[in-house]
Each structure stands twice: as structure tokens, then as C-alpha cells.
Design a protein with these regions (language model features):
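Long, Lys/Arg- and hydrophobic-enriched amphipathic alpha-helices
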Residues: 1-136
Length: 136
């Protein structure tokens, strides 16, 4: 991804420290990460200030507003799945898969309003991604 000068990108160092610290203890199994975000190119394409935002009283806060109510604002950002993919592939090789929540759930979905909400490609189904990491 070719970022622009002055563009803000979120880096998930805490995940990298946790994953690499825990990896020697993980002998076998599947780890699944489900969160909102995307791969770097799609995530930051129209977000020169990054995805960091806050929520206070059901209002979205960005920019300097994030810092006006310390302790009263929930801060969040989208997961940059490119970082997680690269880390996982470097540690585990080809046993890593990334897909949308929609693609992950469709084989199990029933014709209900709840499943329609979870698999809507323009809603939760497209905004949430699933990273499956296997150690065989």
C-alpha cells in the first residue's frame, strides 16, 4: 500500500507482542479472530486520518474531539488485517485464511432476520472479517 505523506495508519503492536509471546505455547489447534476492519489498501483508501475514533453518549468523535473528555470516551479503530496476515504467515506459513464474516457464516446461515443481518455484505457481513490461523 502506498500511503500518502501525512497519512495516519494504525499499527497493532500489542497483537504482535501477544501472538509471538503465546506462539511457543500453542502446539496444535485453530485460532479465530473476528473483528471490524479490512486489509490495508481498502481500509485506508479514503481515510487519510486513519480509522481512530471515539464514542461518547452514542456520538462518534474524531480529530481533536477524541481528547476533550478523557476517561469518558471509548476509543477504537479498525483492525488492519494486513498486519495480522503478514505476522501470521511469517509464523505459521500457509495455514492462515482471511475472509469476510459473510463468507464465514453463509454455509451455516438460515433464512432468519438475524442471519440476514450478520451476513449482509453492506453491513456487518462485509465490515467484519475473520482471520483463521491453524497450527497442525
Amino acid at each position: 500500500y502506498d500511503s500518502q505523506p501525512g497519512q495516519r495508519l494504525e499499527i497493532h503492536d500489542s497483537y504482535a507482542r501477544w501472538f509471538t509471546g503465546w506462539l511457543p505455547l500453542w502446539n496444535m489447534g485453530v485460532m479465530t479472530v473476528i473483528d471490524y476492519g479490512d486489509e490495508m489498501e481498502r481500509l485506508y483508501y479514503r481515510r487519510p486520518q486513519g480509522s481512530l475514533r471515539g464514542y461518547k453518549s452514542h456520538q462518534v468523535l474524531t480529530g481533536e474531539e477524541l481528547y476533550r473528555h478523557p476517561g469518558l470516551t471509548d476509543l477504537t479503530c479498525d483492525v488492519n488485517f494486513t498486519d495480522l496476515l503478514e505476522l501470521s504467515r511469517n509464523c505459521l506459513g500457509d495455514t492462515v485464511t482471511l475472509m469476510t464474516q459473510r463468507d464465514y457464516l453463509l454455509p451455516y446461515a438460515e433464512n432468519t432476520p438475524q442471519d440476514a443481518f450478520l451476513t449482509d455484505e453492506h453491513g456487518a457481513g462485509g465490515h467484519f472479517h475473520v482471520l483463521i490461523q491453524e497450527r497442525l
